[in-house]
From Swiss-Prot:
Cellular component, GO, one term: plasma membrane
Protein name per its UniProtKB record: CASP-like protein 4B1
Keywords: Cell membrane, Membrane, Transmembrane, Transmembrane helix
PANTHER family in the cross-refs: CASP-LIKE PROTEIN 4A4, CASP-LIKE PROTEIN 4B1
Description of how the protein assembles with itself and partners: Homodimer and heterodimers.
Ranges of biased composition (kind: Low complexity): 50-62
Residues in compartment: Cytoplasmic: 1-87, 147-160, 218-221
Membrane topology (UniProt): Multi-pass membrane protein
InterPro entries per record: CASP_dom
Annotated source species: Hordeum vulgare subsp. vulgare (Domesticated barley)
Transmembrane residue ranges: 88-108, 126-146, 161-181, 197-217
Main location: membrane
Origin: domain of life: Eukaryota
Amino acid sequence: MAMQLHAASPDSEHYVAKSPPPPPPLSPHPEPAPAFVKPKSPHVSQGGNAPVATATTPLTPGRVDRARHDHHGGGGGGDEATQLLNGIVLVLRAGAALLSFVAMALVASCRHGDWMDFLRYQEYRYLLGVSVVAFVYSAAQALKNFRRRRRGAADASFLDFAGDQAVAYLLVTASAAALPITIRMRSAVVNVFTDAIAASIALGFLAFAALALSAMLSRHA
C-alpha cells in the first residue's frame, strides 16, 4: 500500500504530469450550411418514394376550347355580334321583299287606258320586271336566313353578298331610268297614274338601299 502511494505521489521522480488535450483549431472561414437542392421535376420520385403531388389543374377539352375562344374572340362577344348582324340582314331582306312587292303591285295597277298604261313605256316595263325579280330574290333570301337561324347553321356566304349587290344594282338602275319620264309627266298632269308610278319609283330606291346595306352587313357577318 505504501509503495502504491509512493508511486502516485507527485514528489516522486517517476511521476509525469498529464496535460489536457488541446482545443480544436478555429477556422477563420466557417463552412456554409449545405444548400437545399430542388428536384428537377416535380413528377420524379426521389429515393424510390411515391411521385410528388403537384398543384397544377389538368386542362379538360372544355377548358382548352374556352381558352382558344377567349384568345381569338375574347369571350362570347364575337358570337353575339355575329348573331345581331345576321338578324339585321334578315330584317333588311324581308323589308326589301315587302317594298319590292308594293312597287310591283303599283306599277301593275297602272292600266287606265290611252297614255296611262305602263305597257306603253319601256322604262315602266323594266321597273316592273326588276321589282318582280327583287321581290322573289329578297323573299327567298329572307326565308332561307330564317331557316338557317333556327337550325343554328352558318349564315353569310359569298353568293348571298354577290346576289344582294346584283339585285340592288338592278333596282337602282330601274328606278333611275323611270324617274325622268315620270318627272316630265307630273310637270304636265298629276293623277292616279303618275302618283302610282312615282310611289313605285320611291319604293324601288328604298328597296335598293335595304339590299345594299344587307350586302355590306352580310360580308362582315
